[in-house]
Amino acid sequence: MKNKPYPYYTNEEYHDLKQMVYSKAEKIPYKPAFSFSAAKNAVVTKTFKDFCDDVEAFGTYLLANGYSGHTGIIGENSYEWLVAFFAVVNMGAVAVPIAKDLSADEIAQLIEKADCDAVLVSKSYADLVSVQDGIKLLSLNDIPTYINSGLERIQSGDTSFRNSQINADKMAAIFFTSGTTGSSKGVMLSHKNMISDTIFACRNFRLTGDSIAVLPFNHTFGLITAIMAQFNYEFCSFINKSTKRVSQDLLTAKPVGTFMVPLFIETFYRTIISTAEKTGKLKKLQTAEKISNALLNVGIDLRKQLFKSVRNAFGGNIEYIICGGAPLEEKYVKKFRSWGVYLYNGYGITECSPVVSVNRNSYWRDGSVGPVLKGCEVRIVADGEVLVKGDNVMLGYYNDEQSTAETLVDGWYHTGDLGHIDTDGFLFLTGRKKNLIILSNGENVSPEEIEARILNDDAVSEVVVYDDGGQIVAEIYPADGFLDDKPHFDSLIRQINDGQPKYKQVSVVKLRKSEFQKNATKKIIRYKVQEEQNNV
């Protein structure tokens, strides 16, 4: 579609998350807000009023029992997880979402690092949590019981939660960064940070129907972007509790849109192509793409009819997927669009609550991460680093004044990402400042730039480019069917090197038998690759 600017969307604005929850309960009390699979795959639906009432009741229970400090939340995505988070932050306390897939030692370290005096954990992960004396422990699975207790207090006249005052500028949550280059930092976000980013993002992009939440709630992309934005648009979000159930839940939820990280997109792409190959329909699919693209050029859109099987893999109603959390290859954007599913790439970081930019419904540019959000400022400094300023920028790192001072200067957050903005305002990312390969001749090489070119080949599943003794190495995890095809990759690298300055040319190609180690948001942990090399 032709890139043509169009007006920003208008949305309701709120002082804090508490006002947002109560506002929706009053405005659209009986409209579905969340749904999820329960016993025997029965689907349970909760309205906006149900959610508000449950949050108030659980918050009342917490206040009555002395829970008013820093509360850790550990568990799979669930309705109870959301009730817990909103109850804690909306009573004026601090929520500390913690990844469920960490080790017991790592969880203990984060609980201590965040000064938690209480922890809410689901039964599935209770064995991982060993709390010290003085730290209270509650089960997320028992929240329905706590809600009933809170309701009894409310019916007896307890208004402590409803009347609790929110200071929108104070810390409301601590989100831990994933740590692809080292230890996690605790990012302090306020109500103002989270609600501002939600409003900013909703000005740029319009959700058009029900969604499904597949990203972990302990990350800002999974919680603030996927849940709070959906909440703001007044659609229902189906809660996926496990990545093992994503395909099944898509068929149940039949979403119009969703939010995903690139790994999900890549997995679905490989599954679609693999299925077409196994059923002997790959040529038919490719022919349909050519016909469809030709018809689109003359204004005829038959994608819903031609690629029904592709859409059915996402439930049948899918129109768009907002993608972030890691770089998304341009080839996937174009391929899915040819099938009638729009991938809107965006850019976000935990420290910015998280969204900074996103491609818009009818205004996008392939290869970019979209226009910067209205209400958020971006500056590109001399060395190419992306700086961000706005009400969505964090308060700082918890108990880490040095890191805060290094990255937050005069209100500008130094992202560590490199990029540029084109004449139409689209932001393009080119790599990470810390990942730059600095050669002995003084030349700088962005490994991500080389990786992007290598990843355009369907034989490449994953790749990391790094420096080894002055030589640029491309370590590749091949796609199925290419695991031992070294000649293919040698030829690929020769093609990529052709026409590039000598200092940017890959000297060594390595193939690996297993995927690269990733963090909770499915980003490759680059320092682990370097550790592997040091141990060889």
Give, region by region, the residue ranges found by the protein language model:
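Conserved AMP-binding A3 loop
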Residues: 45-49, 172-198
